[in-house]
Amino acid sequence: MAAKRGRNRSPSPDPEGMFAGMVVFMVEIGVQRRRLQIWKQKLVQMGAVIEEDRVTKKVTHVLAMNLEALLHKFGKERLSHFTARLMLYQWLEDSLTSGEKANEDLYVLKIDSEEVDKPKKSLPAISGSEDQSSPQKRTRYSPDAGDFKGVESHSNTQGSPDSPTSCSVPSTSASPGEGIAETPTSPQSESTSVYKPPDLNRNITEIFGKLINIYRALGEDRRSFSYYKAIPVIEKFPTRIESVDQLKHLPGIGKAMRDHIQEIVTTGKLSKLEHFETDEKVRTISLFGEVWGVGPATALKLYEKGHRTLEDLKNEDSLTHAQKLGLKYFDDIKTRIPRQEVQEMEQLLQRVGEETLPGVNIVCGGSYRRGKATCGDLDIVVTHPDGQSHKGFLTKFVKRLKEMNFLREDLIFSTHSEEGTDSGVDTYFGLCTYPGQELRRRIDFKVYPRDIYSFGLIAWTGNDVLNRRLRLLAESKGYRLDDTGLFPATHSSSGNRGARGTASLKLSTEKQVFDFLGFPWLEPHERNL
């Protein structure tokens, strides 16, 4: 019998690895099979032994997605006799991300709470983690969007051409080993990528979403991001939150955040938000910050000039062309785009792209690729497999789309592929219309050389929690990561790490980037962290 159990254990642990000495039992409830297998492989590679059959006295750690999953698997009575440490999978993710074992005490699951006597009957699969990308284009946060979009860029135009962000096509990177994403060919393949968290606590996430927008408008991106990180955690929580005691072990939910949640579940409102909404300056700056192209500095200047409404801004001569368009189509741009509409527009772009340049690869990234139900805008990531034909494509593509009356107004247009400047990336930001409609939608195109396409696809798929984690992980290993590559970081004369090197590592697929950084592979629809 002992021999049989031995065959079920993962073989050959590294005796000197980070997890050496650990014997781990992994609760499968709420975890996708592929993710579970990856975690097991990582544990074994780094020294742990996996116990597949049952929790024996040799088991040192039991990992679970949450307390409900643990209770559902074993029951409270049986758990009370375990000598192993009961811990969240988040501990494993954070350890793998940082490259060293995280403090176990912060991830322990406790079973002595009276409110957990009865486990829930059904538990949704959850795949999680967390991030923020560098300052980039500003759009109003919606709980359905899940993208954090930072500050205004140069020339007061919203969104730097070098800064990835927002929404797009299904989970299309067919397999981790393939470099070019493929378009799904059936409703079945598309539906499997849809992101559907339990979302039982919109009373909390909607208030946090409003605070995100206010803090962004005030230029306080760090505070804004703290609420942004908390929202996916709350969205994925499998039950209605009635007490903050339910959240004490969750990542990204600190004491201040728990105090806000307690006030919301107790009173149905948040005094901090009410204060902001009654403050004329905050209210006005927040409103102006919702205009495409207007960041915190510009919003404050407009307020100090005496403007208080969007109607006032229509007579403001200092607005740029892009800001005037953002003002003119303010309501259109704020209107979210249904998933089906994004899919149809993406297919139109692929068809026109193929007519313009056979073999071109066009993928809609961002929230849509991550499986969200709606998008704030469309982020289109483009390349060509031969590594050369993408040069000059965007100019011809935009011209054709304008002839079709699909692209209507330009915001930003910069080309570098033919000159070889700016990493050879071409950029177009503008407004488009769905066929048969006049409602303006925001659309961005980024055309990448094939050899850096994987970096662009990761960056423009997001989410921003993931992007930030990957950047920090790269920095910890002596690299700088952005949408154009992974570069060895140079050092200043004082020995401090400075700017990035000039040559990027050659990593042709998203999975190769994840693997090099040592971050567990996530399918696009798993990246709503």
Curated annotation (Swiss-Prot):
The keyword Nucleus applies. Mn(2+) binds at D377, D379, D444. SMART domains: POLXc (SM00483). Signal peptide: none annotated. The active site is at H260. SUPFAM superfamilies: BRCT domain, DNA polymerase beta, N-terminal domain-like, Nucleotidyltransferase, PsbU/PolX domain-like. It catalyses: DNA(n) + a 2'-deoxyribonucleoside 5'-triphosphate = DNA(n+1) + diphosphate. Its cofactor is Mn(2+). GO terms for cellular component: nucleus. This is DNA polymerase lambda. It comes from Arabidopsis thaliana (Mouse-ear cress). The gene is POLL.
